[in-house]
Amino acid sequence: MLWIAPFAIACARLYYCAFEWERYADNPISILYIWEGGIAIYGAVIGAALGVFIHCKFIKKISVLAVLDVVSLGFMIGQMLGRWGNFFNREAHGGVTDSFLRMGLINPYTGTGAYYHPTFLYESLWNLVGFIIIHFLSKKRKYDGQVALMYVAWYGLGRAFIEGLRTDSLWWGNFRVSQVLAAASCLIAVIALIVLAFRPHDPQNLFVNKVAAKAAAEEASEETAEETKGE
């Protein structure tokens, strides 16, 4: 599934460029100049999810939802660590604040400094807490896709609030794109979790249990065949 990584990066770039089109309209080829900066995490998540769907549905012929359950936890770890890149680059921070949680930055051109909301830290910690909680709950999941829904709900909830603090948001009219997407995805995921919570679920229908049952049946069949030969 390594090919999904460049797929996610490409979608992260396209997502960013789509909402910053005025920068690229006169020279669309510059969309390829990714080293100049300009990617968005939501584009990466959407791209990775789409890549997983293609890989599972058309290549491996396995459960898309079951794989999304697994990679969702990986998403949270990746986002938790990846946000620290914003710290080292001194980017993607919030507005000026006097909060006890603040990050000091000095303008290299003027030599003046100020304290800002370290939104990278907020999101990193939010993902860490989410990973711990969802990892624990994943051991009691009742259906394929449940973990993925919890991830979407958790991340969307945090991002909807954190995005409102940032100074570098992508805008669509008067709306912060990622904030709207985060709130909408959180709401949809929560509704899905509530609806599915009231439906009966057979643990044997979990993809991992189906695979285990199939493997056990094949092993039993092989043992029976060997015993028959021995007779």
Which stretches of residues belong to each language-model region?
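A feature for loop-to-transmembrane-helix boundaries and adjacent hydrophobic helices
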Residues: M1-E231
